[in-house]
UniProtKB/Swiss-Prot annotation:
Protein name: Malignant T-cell-amplified sequence 1
Family, as annotated: Belongs to the MCTS1 family.
Main location: cytoplasm
InterPro entries: MCT-1/Tma20, Pre-PUA, PUA, PUA-like_sf, Uncharacterised_CHP00451
SUPFAM superfamilies: PUA domain-like
Record localization: Cytoplasm
The keyword Transcription appears for this protein: yes
A Pfam cross-reference name: Pre-PUA
Lineage: Eukaryota, Metazoa, Chordata, Craniata, Vertebrata
Free-text comment on this protein's domains from its UniProt entry: The PUA RNA-binding domain is critical for cap binding, but not sufficient for translation enhancer function.
Name of encoding gene: mcts1
Disulfide pairings: none
GO molecular function: RNA binding
Keyword annotations of the record: Cell cycle, Cytoplasm, Growth regulation, Transcription, Transcription regulation
Amino acid sequence: MFKKFDEKENVSNCIQLKTSVIKGIKNQLLDQFPNIDDWLNQIMPKKDPVKIVRCHEHIEILTVNGELLFFRQREGPFYPTLRLLHKYPFILPHQQVDKGAIKFVLSGANIMCPGLTSPGAKLYPAESDTVVAIMAEGKQHALCVGVMKMSADDIEKVNMGIGIENVHYLNDGLWHMKTYK
């Protein structure tokens, strides 16, 4: 999604949100990420301005004080940015890939089933279409945010094809964006 993303070329406009819209977004975030409940007021303080940065390809990035927090495509689900995920790693369920998959994931490739079932990888129970953080064997922080394309049970049974779609990874265009004022 952000492989060829460039802030100067892809950002079309930025709008400040009304309080009623912010409440709706917070409720949507709570529904989507129940683990965020205790931390949402710390992530999105009440008095701080919340803005939506609109980009090409119908991508919207939610910012507070210029810090990029969540993004979504069209009116789809929100995904946390990796910077937010590194501060609050418990927001998303984790899946772990083996060392051999790291360079491919960091170049934007989707996570294949064998990379999740081999020694060194850890596959935790999760349903299809669940937003997950991708951890790497021997690494502390998440290297990618992805969406399960199959349930964990199906990944173990089939062990072929794409298991998790890579949505946002370290060093992609969104990672390099840092802040937006």
